[in-house]
Design a protein with these regions (language model features):
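Short helix-loop capping/hinge motifs at secondary-structure junctions, enriched
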Residues: 5-9, 60-63
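Catalytic-pocket segment enriched in acidic/His residues
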Residues: 29-171
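Short, structured patches in soluble enzyme cores that scaffold and shape functional sites
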Residues: 1-3, 21-26, 55, 73
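N-terminal accessory regions of nucleic-acid-interacting proteins
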Residues: 6-20
Length: 171
């Protein structure tokens, strides 16, 4: 979002954008408890939403409703779609969100993913590409590896870390 947006009409929505970037909004499905419960533990984990590698100015993307979206895991194409296939397009999302909250400059709206969700495990390389915007590349690491690399061991102790390392696909 490029300027404060409140009660924006769909026809004016793109005027409130600063630009576009690539976002890979991971879900840690190990923690999915129930469809009807808030999925705070599923979506809001340290380092589970990489963004970038840059932002493309809104003027440099003439038609955001016709962009190809692709995801590769370890070089294998897993998702291919288009922003034309989105259930809710960007103008709708801005109109809807701004109807009950003020969007501020710097706010981001993640729009979802094409068909074809796939599980990833530590060691996998994931590449997400939005045509005309960029390509985001990241490597999946285990939670214990993530904290160890930053010198911040979890305070839950050795037993917890061992349990994390023994989960399927954690090595």
């Amino acid at each position: 979002i490029g300027k404060p947006a409140r009660n924006v009409k769909r026809a004016d929505a793109l005027d409130y954008l600063a630009g576009y970037t690539v976002c890979n909004d991971y879900a840690i499905r190990d923690y999915l408890e129930n469809y009807y419960r808030p999925n705070l533990r599923v979506k809001n984990r340290d380092a589970t939403t990489p963004v970038g590698p840059w932002m493309v100015d809104v003027a440099d993307v003439p038609d955001p409703s016709q962009l190809k979206l692709r995801t590769w895991i370890n070089g294998e194409l897993k998702q291919e779609g288009s922003t034309a296939d989105m259930i809710f397009d960007i103008p709708y999302l801005i109109e809807y969100f701004s109807s009950f909250m003020t969007l501020q400059p710097g706010d981001m709206i993640a729009t979802g993913t094409p068909e074809g969700l796939a599980d990833v495990v530590p060691g996998d390389e994931v590449v997400v590409e939005v045509e005309g915007v960029g390509r985001l590349v990241n490597r999946i690491v285990s939670e214990s590896e993530f904290f160890a690399a930053r010198g911040k061991r979890k305070t839950r102790g050795k037993q917890h870390d061992q349990a994390l390392d023994q989960r399927p696909g954690s090595r």
